[in-house]
Every structure is written in structure tokens, then in C-alpha cells.
Design a protein with these regions (language model features):
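Short, cationic-aromatic polyanion-contact patches
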Residues: 16, 40, 77-91
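Short, hydrophobic-biased segments on the C-terminal half of alpha helices
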Residues: 59-60
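All-alpha effector-binding/dimerization core of bacterial HTH-type transcriptional repressors
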Residues: 3-7, 82-253
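Extreme N-terminal segment that seeds HTH/winged-HTH DNA-binding domains in transcriptional regulators
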Residues: 1-50
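Beta-hairpin "wing" of winged helix-turn-helix
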Residues: 63-73, 79-80
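Residues in the helix-turn-helix
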Residues: 54
Length: 253
């Protein structure tokens, strides 16, 4: 089918996640027309080097998200609004990807990390005891060199299997770092959306005035076994990052 040439193939270990990522790239690419019928499950499986079952799982997720519709007799159709669903807030992704999806070159600076005792709130979020040691990582994200977001990551020390890392390692994406050093597979997160304003520290970090409105996301990342692995607090400037969400209409008749 024209318009669907793609060179990436999927690694078996994260087949569904990678299949989702690649199909999303296909759908939002500039050379793909809206409302284009997707290739068959068999063809997608062949192109991505995965099973039809894995493709079916990925398509089921995309259908649930509202990106595609499977219509009997017509196949799998890309919904017209799919391209507008950038920076989806219902998809757990790295902050850098959200910034890139909004058209900016991503940078990271001011990375700091240390070990500290968990507060009562941190302990509750991570399902550990208050006072247990956690790794705390702070970093600032840039959009075309301008401050765009500030993130605080917290991970229980007891989950680490490998303590051989440096600040330079933490400048990279946090999800692969956690999976490698805690030997787990992150599968989903639960987020809270909290209106916030910049205090003195955030104003200085993000180069805005105190009291500037910010979007705050609190997220707890879970692994395949359902363990709370990481608790994140993220602050965004809305002129650099705008989130979208496709909601299913539900009403009482």
C-alpha cells in the first residue's frame, strides 16, 4: 500500500509497545493521508517482524484510544482527528518526547541526584515506609534552548540492583535507566493533573515570574508485577507543551 514504507522492525522484548510507537509514527507522518485504511494485520506483522497477535493487541489499544476504527467490510480506518492527538496525556512517555512532538529541539540541563529519606507523601505514593531511602533526581528540560519543563523523579533504593551510574547517565531518558538498574519492565502509570503556580525555586529554574501558572503532573510508574517503581512530579510551561486526550462520549439517555 502506498504511503506505508517503514524501515524499523520491532525488538521482541517490547513488541507491543514498539509496534504502537511505529504505527503511531505512520499515522502522524506527513506522507500519510488522513482517513487512510491501514494495511492488514498480516501485512503489518510482516513489515514489523512480529506476530499477528502482537499487531492485534497494538491495534486494540489504538482503537480504545480513538486513533483508529475497525469497520466491518472497510478494514481499519485512521480517524480524521488522529493527527491532532499529539502529546497524548493518556500515553506514558518521556518528557523529551512530549517536547519534540510540539516541534522543538529537546535539551536537558541542571541534572542533580542524591539519596534521601522518603517523606510521608513519597512513602505513600511508592508503597514503602516513611524514612526509607529513595533516589531523587531533578532535571530541567529545554525547548530550542529555552526552559520548558522541570521534573523530579523518586525511586526506592531497595529496588536497585545496579548502583553503578553517574549524573551523565541520568541526563538520558529515565525509563530505560530505571528498567536497566532496577531490572523491571515499566508498563503503565497513574497520573494526577494539578494546577500550580511557580514558587521562587520554579520561577528561577523556568525563568518566569513567581506566580506564573504551570501545569503539574504527578505520576506513579508501575512495573509488570504491579509494583510502584517511580514517583514523578513534572512542571510544564503551557506555551511549549500542550497535551491532548481523546475521550469516548458517554451520557445517560
Amino acid at each position: 500500500m502506498a504511503g506505508w514504507h517503514h524501515g524499523r522492525r520491532v525488538k521482541k522484548s517490547t513488541a507491543v509497545q514498539e509496534a504502537l510507537e511505529i504505527i503511531r509514527e505512520m499515522i502522524t507522518s506527513s506522507d500519510v493521508e488522513e482517513n487512510l485504511r491501514l494495511p492488514s494485520e498480516e501485512e503489518l506483522a510482516l513489515r514489523l517482524g512480529i506476530s499477528r497477535l502482537t499487531v492485534r493487541e497494538a491495534l486494540t489499544i489504538l482503537e480504545r484510544e480513538g486513533v483508529i476504527a475497525r469497520i466491518q467490510g472497510r478494514g481499519t480506518i485512521v480517524n480524521r482527528f488522529a493527527r491532532r492527538l499529539t502529546s497524548r496525556i493518556d500515553s506514558a512517555r518521556e518528557i523529551g518526547k512530549f517536547i519534540a512532538e510540539n516541534g522543538y529541539t529537546v535539551g536537558v540541563d541542571n541534572v542533580q541526584h542524591w539519596w534521601q529519606a522518603a517523606t510521608a507523601l513519597e512513602a505513600k505514593k511508592l508503597a514503602i515506609s516513611e524514612g526509607e531511602e529513595i533516589l531523587l533526581v531533578q532535571k530541567r528540560f529545554l525547548a530550542d534552548g529555552n526552559p520548558a519543563a522541570f521534573c523530579i523523579d523518586r525511586v526506592p533504593k531497595k529496588l536497585f540492583c545496579d548502583f553503578n551510574f553517574s549524573t551523565a547517565d541520568l541526563e538520558q531518558a529515565i525509563f530505560p535507566f530505571i528498567e536497566a538498574h532496577c531490572r523491571c519492565q515499566l508498563t503503565h502509570d497513574v497520573i494526577e493533573i494539578i494546577p500550580a503556580v511557580a514558587d521562587t525555586k520554579l520561577a528561577r529554574c523556568l525563568q518566569v515570574n513567581e506566580g506564573t501558572p504551570l501545569l503539574r503532573l504527578d505520576a506513579v510508574e508501575y512495573d509488570l508485577e504491579g509494583r510502584a517503581v517511580m514517583y514523578n512530579t513534572e512542571y510544564y510551561l503551557d506555551h511549549f507543551v500542550r497535551f491532548t486526550l481523546c475521550r469516548i462520549v458517554s451520557y445517560m439517555t
